[in-house]
């Protein structure tokens, strides 16, 4: 880490050395206790049982179900496949209402199965699906609602369930961000027909690659187990269409190891979040995403909205941060509706998504987890404070540099 930034010329954007010698990513994979992980992997290798619903997968499913307080956990090879299998098991067809403000996999999992994702707007306060927008999007072709717990903050579960019940729709949730979070005292995983989890290596809890569907519906769980294994019930009896969605034993070993230290990981995330909050408390125009302190949350993401009072546009700040090796990210930009194939299929979708568009142009997610410590967060806080205080000088300096570059070319 280099010396403090005192003037625009000290910014790496204008040619100075970066604040951090090595890039700081939004997250860094947690491996838990390495000795315990390697012991589990060695046990897998010694058993010669590498996949096909082995003992490590069964133990992981039970441990995760116990942690969440759900009856059934069906582990699969990734979160996207979990979405696809659940969508098929619920017999969704026609149209399903989803937010555009989500990772593209949520929409792709529907479109891949010839189901039309209908993009509803978000509530600007929660950043989750707006129940009023959902209600306005329902048509005779609508078969379900797919909510997303963005950044670990649960959707308006009760309102969405009321709409689903009243209109005869299936309700499921993409809980990829929300492992370890609660809503009204119940752990996420207990809502809707089922909830989907992602254990990709970028998540604070991971299985290298992996995912799961959790549900309290035994009949649905059986359909899911059949679907992840080609539809086999027994050695030679295929009873339904299926795919190869099985989690392997090594991934499950990582999951079991990660669960043992999940409380410590969340504690670290919370400490980082609170330190960011303290360091930017007097920075104008930066709005830190808040959590309901009465509920459990995983503090997986440190998300800020860059507002007009900051003095620079979000993307200009992003350029400054990246030049300093602070690899903040835009979550979610530009929204699913503005990506292919949806941009071409639904060119007018943007007209009904004003809050989605506004938020996607303001949000940044900052490095946290084991990627940063106290010194790094303090330095990022000082950088943000400097940029906000000197935003006018930075804009002028940037314009001057651009003019000089044009005149010399």
Model regions and ranges:
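N-terminal "arm"/small-domain region of PLP-dependent enzymes with the aminotransferase-like
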Residues: 1-50, 169, 367
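Phosphate-binding glycine-rich loop
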Residues: 49-95, 101, 109-112, 119-121, ...
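A short alpha/beta connector and helix-capping loop motif
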Residues: 128-135, 185-194, 384-385
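Structural detector of well-ordered beta-strand residues that form the stable sheet scaffold
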Residues: 74, 97, 118, 171-172, ...
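PLP-dependent aminotransferase-like
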Residues: 5-12, 17, 88-175, 182
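Active-site PLP attachment segment
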Residues: 190-226, 249-252
């Amino acid at each position: 880490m280099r010396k403090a930034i005192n003037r625009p010329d000290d910014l790496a954007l204008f040619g100075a050395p970066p604040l951090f010698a090595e890039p700081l990513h939004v997250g860094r994979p947690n491996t838990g206790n390495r000795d315990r992980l390697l012991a589990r992997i060695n046990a897998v290798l010694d058993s010669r049982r590498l996949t096909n619903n082995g003992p490590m997968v069964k133990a992981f499913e039970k441990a995760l179900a116990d942690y969440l307080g759900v009856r059934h956990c069906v582990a699969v090879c990734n979160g996207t496949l979990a979405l696809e299998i659940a969508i098929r098991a619920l017999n969704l067809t026609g149209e399903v209402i989803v937010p555009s403000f989500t990772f593209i996999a949520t929409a792709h999992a529907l479109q891949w199965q010839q189901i039309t994702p209908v993009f509803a707007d978000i509530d600007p306060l929660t950043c989750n699906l707006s129940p009023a927008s959902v209600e306005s999007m329902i048509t005779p072709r609508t078969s379900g609602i797919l909510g997303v717990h963005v950044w670990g903050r649960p959707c308006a579960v009760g309102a969405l369930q009321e709409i689903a019940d009243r209109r005869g729709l299936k309700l499921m949730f993409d809980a990829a961000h929300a492992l370890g979070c609660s809503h009204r005292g119940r752990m996420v995983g207990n809502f809707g027909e089922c909830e989907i989890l992602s254990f990709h290596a970028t998540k604070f809890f991971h299985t290298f690659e992996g995912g799961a569907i959790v549900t309290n519906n035994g009949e649905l769980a059986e359909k899911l187990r059949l679907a992840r294994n080609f539809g086999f019930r027994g050695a030679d009896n295929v009873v339904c269409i299926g795919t190869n969605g099985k989690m392997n034993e090594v991934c499950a070993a990582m999951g079991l190891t990660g669960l043992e230290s999940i409380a410590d990981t969340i504690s670290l995330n919370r400490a980082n979040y609170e330190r960011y909050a303290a360091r930017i408390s007097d920075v104008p125009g930066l709005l830190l995403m808040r959590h309901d302190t009465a509920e459990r949350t995983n503090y997986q993401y440190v998300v800020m909205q860059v507002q007009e009072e900051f003095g620079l546009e979000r993307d200009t700040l992003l350029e400054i941060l990246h030049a300093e090796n602070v690899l903040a990210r835009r979550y979610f930009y530009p929204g699913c509706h503005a990506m292919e194939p949806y941009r071409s299929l639904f060119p007018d979708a943007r007209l009904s998504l004003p809050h989605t568009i506004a938020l996607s142009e303001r949000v940044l997610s900052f490095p946290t987890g084991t990627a940063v410590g106290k010194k790094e967060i303090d330095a990022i806080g000082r950088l943000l404070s400097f940029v906000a205080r000197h935003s006018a000088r930075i804009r002028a300096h940037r314009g001057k540099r651009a003019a000089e570059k044009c005149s010399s070319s």
